[in-house]
Amino acid sequence: MKLNWETTLLILLVLEILLFGAINPRMLDINMLLFSTSDFICIGIVALPLTLVIISGGIDISLGSTIGLCAIALGVMMQFGLPMYLAVPLTLLLGLLCGLFNAALIHYTGISPLVITLGTLYLYGGGALLLSGLAGATGYEGIGGFPDSFTAFANLTVLGLPIPLVLFAVITFFFWLITHRGRFGRHLFLIGQNPRAARYAALSVNGMPYALYGLVGVASAIAALVMVSYFGSARSDLGRDLLMPALTAAVLGGANIYGGSGSVIGTALAALLVGYLQQGLQMVGIPNQVSSALSGALLVVVVMGRSLSLHREWVRNFFTKHTRSLR
């Protein structure tokens, strides 16, 4: 029986947990498994819309800086006495505007999304540092003093499940619905597979990036809100370490770096796989630097595997040719 990739990822996730559990039995504790997701679930929150961007043939590497900018902006608004019921929607709006700005630059300049979002990565990161400096929040302290009702949010539970995990499940369902069960998703895959054919089919090839990058921006703002609530402080560097794991989750989940294919469920499972990998390595005493290096190595291996699978015929001919030459 041939397993699909999502099933394979689920099996790998279970094996990963069992492996780390054999080394450290705490890894098998159900409460630890559930509540430790709050440490890394933001990887999945931003990886889901990033998957859609990759399916379309684009990329967004500015999401980490967008998270930092949204986080510090939330802190500044709180410092100026703005109530949280206004500051939270404004933070979401800021994330949306960052995403739309990326899309507008890509649309009107025609420059590669990689180059554009590399530029905005530094633009948003610089803006976050500027706001942080103006607010007097330098170093690792950030801006604290958030209302208890806000900081308690990330520690609430619904049916015994932590709120961040429930939020991730809801966001996953939303993206699965629009990507795999609607006209939006069909248009998305067609644009990623063949933009020229999509234009001939009268699809909104130029309009699609605004929706996709806007979703990444909003998801980045949501991640910022969750992280600020969880850590109790707003810092400009909150999203610094999320880009590589999020990109790894999207590609490991099945997103084709050349566009045209991908899976929301695959990305969700891959995000848990990457997150529990980080948690497991920390629990067995592996430094964070090694964990980051392994995430990068995993991304390289997955990209190489995807590239080889796309050029399967060339690889087969290459080995056939060299095998004959050795005889």
From Swiss-Prot:
Superkingdom per UniProt: Bacteria
Compartments, as annotated in UniProt: Cell inner membrane
NCBIfam families, per database record: PRK15038.1
Keyword Transport part of the UniProt annotation: yes
MF term (GO), any: transmembrane transporter activity
Name the record gives this protein: Autoinducer 2 import system permease protein LsrD
Keywords, comma-separated and alphabetical: Cell inner membrane, Cell membrane, Membrane, Transmembrane, Transmembrane helix, Transport
Ranges annotated as spanning the membrane: 3-23, 41-61, 63-83, 86-106, 114-134, 158-178, 211-231, 257-277, 283-303
